[in-house]
């Protein structure tokens, strides 16, 4: 990693008053400090309408969906809107070649037709409590601290029973979560209702919900109907409960009214949701590490993975269903890394962070605070010290563990090997291996694709990048013995009992201890896992001193700026952000408007490119201009719009509300130029990409003919 400093640029940035430009993402309890500015942009709400700790507010209608997305309640029957890509896994699990809901969409026309989704959870925040004093008191009592407890969600949440009482903490259907903010300088507890009976109600075809797919991802203008619809169910008393046929639709204490009157450039926009991760307090060296190691390796290895997957998906519909979710997930992180690196280079984000760093150091020096400079030096030392380890770790993670499925093959433990002659223990061990095999050899895995393409391509590149002496022993010895990654992979699939179901079942009929222990795929997986654990431990040695230094550095920033003026980094907790509906100029001579229409869908149509196929029914509606009440005043059909709000991953599915707190859209993406907003908000370039609620309603009504949902939502025209 190259360390580069730019003294001339630094002076220019310092003189430009760039210190922590802040577009959000604000904590709910910071609402009072933002209301005046929000009203200056046109908002007509009061603070208590958005967040009221003593009553209902918009906060109560915004949910966390499936641990990493956001959703919004829009009826008194627990109807929930989120993005198509947020519900993608559930849609995929219900899909088959015979009932391909990914391709054709899914529409339930009664409650009885709604589909159950085991394992899916939705959370609603009930209370938010400042527990900083209590947490710091408990942290002081730790007898053998690891040095990271002050940031650990698991450890922090384990303190909840001491804070709220053991009886309260054991309430069925509730979860208490304590998280660190500002690098561990503040702590808040979130009391949540957890719903586990969440049913799929509707989803458009992927040709609508994923229109433009990976080519348009992170891009504006956009033309995507990115939504899916679910419903929360509760027991007959209205409490969260596990699935039961006796459960009834949940009646929330608050839902958001839907406004179908349309939007215009300059309108106020409010977004609430669960942004995942940002890095606004990074030092310059941390930006360099993120770009040159994390992002560069992700771009390289996922590019190889995705090229192979896409080629195979286009050739076989069965493979397409099998790998659809994996490909979408990989592509999302890939393009995010590309966009972040573009912003770091073109928008000089490293230099901006260097300027901010110097500003904090100058402030601390003036105040006589020596710990700030010590913290910056400690951060740089940790980054430099872990450079080679982190590089090896990232190649192993992106290239092997996340890319090659056989790294998840079953591993025979010492218990079955040592007690093979004990029939009971041998059988128990074999059943454990069967369970591992079933988890590994699921419907989302193709041995043929793995053997012939994926494993060879990724393992070849990994071996080119990592010196042999630093590779997992199975990879090092296998490539040396067989002459190439290709020959090594072919040997594994030729000999492993896990290479096919037939071979596995044959082994289970006549199990052999030596064959089990010598299995090449199992040894590959065990060797990779060992190397991963070894690297994780070595990298982790830098975690505690780095976290302590970051905490000290952020404490100085917090003291300098003051908490009311400084939003903390995102960490999957409920936030709000606000701005206006507005286009932008990404580069010279290029200007983008704020809204897109169905006309743009037809302009992009390409029957020979799966990303831009237009459903015949949608095309017929377009040709007839059969838009009903959902059209713009000029007769065009709205699809998407963009706003200056500050969002990131986790905000997918976030409600976008107007000046009166009425739903006008669903956030689903960011523009390419704004991905760097995870480090520094860039108001002239950063845009949230939003599904216009009228397009969602139009698809439900005119495309699907699902009148019961329109009747339930009761949009205001």
Swiss-Prot record:
GO terms for cellular component: cell surface; extracellular region. InterPro entries: Pep_S46, Peptidase_S1_PA, Peptidase_S1_PA_chymotrypsin. Residues 1-21 form the signal peptide. The record marks 670 as: Is essential for the Asp/Glu P1 specificity of DPP11. GO terms for biological process: peptide catabolic process; proteolysis. It holds the Pfam family Peptidase_S46. Keywords: Aminopeptidase, Hydrolase, Protease, Secreted, Serine protease, Signal. Its EC number is 3.4.14.-. The active site is at 85 (charge relay system), 226 (charge relay system), 652 (charge relay system). Enzyme activity is completely blocked by diisopropyl-fluorophosphates, moderately by phenylmethylsulfonyl fluoride (PMSF) and 4-(2-methyl)benzenesulfonyl fluoride, and slightly by pepstatin in vitro. GO terms for molecular function: dipeptidyl-peptidase activity; serine-type aminopeptidase activity. It is found in: Secreted; Cell surface. Optimum pH is 7.0. The keyword RNA-binding does not apply. The keyword Acetylation does not apply. SUPFAM superfamilies: Trypsin-like serine proteases (SSF50494). Belongs to the peptidase S46 family. Catalyzes the removal of dipeptides from the N-terminus of oligopeptides. Shows a strict specificity for acidic residues (Asp or Glu) in the P1 position, and has a hydrophobic residue preference at the P2 position. Is likely involved in amino acid metabolism and bacterial growth/survival of asaccharolytic P.endodontalis, that utilizes amino acids from extracellular proteinaceous nutrients as energy and carbon sources. This is Asp/Glu-specific dipeptidyl-peptidase. It comes from Porphyromonas endodontalis (strain ATCC 35406 / DSM 24491 / JCM 8526 / CCUG 16442 / BCRC 14492 / NCTC 13058 / HG 370) (Bacteroides endodontalis).
